[in-house]
Amino acid sequence: MSQQRGIQNTENRGSKNKGEKLRTILDDSTKTIYGMNTSKYMSKDNFLLGDTAFITLDSSLTNIEKVSPDEKNQFTYQSLGNIGTPINNIFNYYPSTFSISSGINSLNYYYLVSSEAKFYDTKSPYIDLSLFFGGNGRSMVDFVFSRNINKNWNIGFDIHRISADKQISASKAKGDKNINSSLFKLFVYHKSEDEKLTLYSDFVSFRHQILGNGGVDVDSDSLPLNFFTYNDFSTRLKDIENLERRKRLNLFLNYKIIEGLEIYNDFYFKTQQVEYMDENYVENAPYYNDFFLSNISTLDSIKIKSVVNRAGVRGLLGDIKYNFYANYKNLNYLYTDNLNANIFNEIYLGGIINFSRKEFDILADFKLKTTGDYSLLGKLKSKVFEISYYSGLHVPTLFQSSYSGNHFQWDNEYNSSFINTLEAKVKINTNSIMLSPFIRLSSIKDYIYLSNEKNPTQHDEILINNQFGVNLNLNLFNKIINLESRYSYNTVSKSSADIFNIPKHHIYSRLFYNGKWFNNSIPVQFGVNAYLRSEYYGNAYEPSLQAYYVQNNFLLERNLRLNLFYAMQVKNLRVFLKMTHFSQFDKFDGYFVTPYYPAQKKVLDLGIKWYFFN
């Protein structure tokens, strides 16, 4: 009996083991592995250009240490020395949009980059989490969630946060806020079963608060400063606040009629509200020249609403992608002291034609308004060279035409600005060297800018700005040692000398080690980012207008900035450490990035980027 029980138990255990093995085989064979290759996205802009390929998630360590807009753009932007502060493109003075706009755009970067429309196809639930913990009370959070309900529907949301303490004249060691910014986006994407209908919709809410101080109180005649005391600096203003709110509702529909012929409609409803508040009249009054509405306190605001609808036809004829459309925009705005809103209506026709072959790519993009204003862009691209030409007549922005606040008021009738730009570059590639000389020749007539008096001015002469430079990339020892660099030399015409204030020399370099440690399982990068520019009279910032203006008194000294970094990756987790402004060897040393606003002093920063699947 005992033998039989033993045999029976053995048989039972054998059956059990066989069952477990069978289950394991079934589990391993049926289990789907979700990861980098199963979660993809496509931008709506690329979709409209006919590029319908989904993009795999970025898992590279390259440039992961760059957080602020000026760092990400090789310091071709200026800011107020802190993350989340208003920014200005140093080298590009031309309107970024053809359609009439508010013109209050110093915070555009934080809104546009985070609210970009993307079509996600993630298969499984997907999370993209980015955390930045900067020294001196600076932090950023980017959270993206997306999941496929089924193979045809995807939903998700984004949350983006920026928080930063004051870096100069802080009233306490921690928590004296300079920046509070948040953006929330809810989106849905649908592709029908027969792949004829594409639907995308999103809702975006953006709030950006700046608790400013007008910069440090120094006389331009006392420059350069020998000591940067940061928290002990006196400031030009106290307890002022800028607050900008934006909302956006977008509904996009695309329908394929037949192969090569599709129709679409893209609808937007947008709001923008900008406020400037200063209730500290006693201390701040000497800063202002005029008081038009109140000599006790300032509460300026502008409210803008716009409805935009674009209807078009797009498709593919052989090697030619085409997109022809009509664009309608209704815009109304209201200032603090206005009882009735001002209304604008705008209509223009546009088209994009792209002829693509393996050897080269030709693109033509044109827009024409009923007023005669136009935009024309042509590009020719091959493996060896690229050349582009742009010509356009751009109407003044609302801000340039009309403004009503407590400290500034104007009502202008300006001509459209006439812009011409020619760009070209050559690419020379070998196994270890990429050399790419480039040139940009630009001219603009009837240029509109904020003058030193902080009022719009239109210059009727032709202004010329030319840029010559070279991009150089090197990789040595089987791509273990790498160098990425860019140098530009900038010139302006005599008529532009006090209007286009740009550094004559500008250099960016990234020298880094790239390899794998711990039995080739952990990718690692470490190195230095270097930025060098020559001295120039950089544009200054006016808080009450939330805008940059031309000035010719405050000289920004030549400076070299070095950021040391170390980055590593463990599966879906990437981490970096960065010593920002490592080249500040003396704690009282420093420089100005914008008149009256010092650069970030030396701090240690930590960043994390983590993907989660299923």
Predicted region positions:
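Outer-membrane beta-barrel translocator/receptor signature
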Residues: 109-111, 120-129, 133-167, 179-184
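Transmembrane beta-strand segments of Gram-negative outer membrane beta-barrel proteins
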Residues: 88-102, 117-133, 263, 322
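Exposed, low-structure sequence patches enriched in small/polar residues
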Residues: 122-124, 244-280, 296-614
